[in-house]
Amino acid sequence: MRCRDQALASALGEEGKGLVFVADPDVSDRWQDVRAELHEAFALTKQAAIEGEPVVYIVRGDDLLGRNGIGAAMAATALLSGARTASLEAKESAINVLAIEEQSGPGAVAAWAWHLLNSEGPRGELVRLGGSHLGKALP
């Protein structure tokens, strides 16, 4: 697990299979910082895929809409694209994205993350918590 939010990390715990990668909401607009974020996600995802483990990327829904800065938008949309592409290549691993809102509680986020990690459900999909995306142009 890679999570810098203490409350969410506590809710997620360390148990269970797979990788939960929580995008850094404070990633700067500097390309080097975005690249470092994506490099870390790639390295961890590659290891999970080799082991046949599922992956969930957690991003802020507003980052997918470009509302919180260029760096956060680049990282979130790249993770979404990466999840979709990796799902085509890593057929043994479910790789999905969970988009959360400011008011998404850590318990709800953790429950959805663990559901995606432990189900035979979607692959390469975006699951949104909340409704702030409704009525917007979506990626």
Summary of predicted features, one role per range:
Residues G124-P139:
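Short C-terminal tail/terminal secondary-structure segment
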Residues E101-Q103, S132-H133:
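A short, acidic, flexible beta-alpha connecting loop/helix-capping segment that sits on the rim
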